[in-house]
Amino acid sequence: MEIRGTTILAVRHKGHVALAGDGQVTLGQSVVMKHTAKKVRRMYKNQVIAGFAGTTADAFTLFERFDNYLEETNGNLVRAAVELAKEWRKDKYLRRLEAMLLVVDKDHTFVLSGTGDVIEPDDGIAAIGSGGLYAVAAARALVAHSELSAAEIARESMRITAEICVFTNLNLTLETL
């Protein structure tokens, strides 16, 4: 059976960035295996925040490789993301990994996809996982029509997403820079 289901959301707003992830792990289409998974973590001297969607073992492999590139590049998020993407595209083992990363620092937001793409959103809002599209839509609406902080927008967007997406819950991990 396929293990799936999560939402990871990044919101960059008013000079701050928030990265939120829910805690649900779902087996197949109908069984919730865990409610309190931690899919968001700080990296490289607390200057980078990363979240994952996809198979847990694959995500940890990517976290480890990404962390190594952050160390090699002295925390340069752009270079680390590009180097990981290059390796991801070239390595036969990595190409089979079923995971995505959403990474942020004080200046950049990137989605690192399983095909080796590095995507930086135009508006600083990005999401991955089963509820990603709902979370992005909610965050964009809140940015345009409220005075909330990045963290408040991320939290409220994840609440809205959890009401719509059965693979997302409200046990959030929220980190900010």
UniProtKB/Swiss-Prot annotation:
Gene3D superfamilies, A to Z: Glutamine Phosphoribosylpyrophosphate, subunit 1, domain 1
Residues the entry annotates as binding Na(+): A162, C165, T168
InterPro entries (alphabetical): ATP-dep_Prtase_HsIV_su, Ntn_hydrolases_N, Proteasome_sua/b, Proteasome_suB-type
Catalytic function, reaction form: ATP-dependent cleavage of peptide bonds with broad specificity
UniProt cross-references to HAMAP family, sorted A to Z: HslV
NCBIfam families hit by this protein: ATP_dep_HslV, PRK05456.1
Annotated protein name in UniProt: ATP-dependent protease subunit HslV
Organism name: Lawsonia intracellularis (strain PHE/MN1-00)
Phylogenetic classification of the source organism: Bacteria, Pseudomonadati, Thermodesulfobacteriota, Desulfovibrionia, Desulfovibrionales
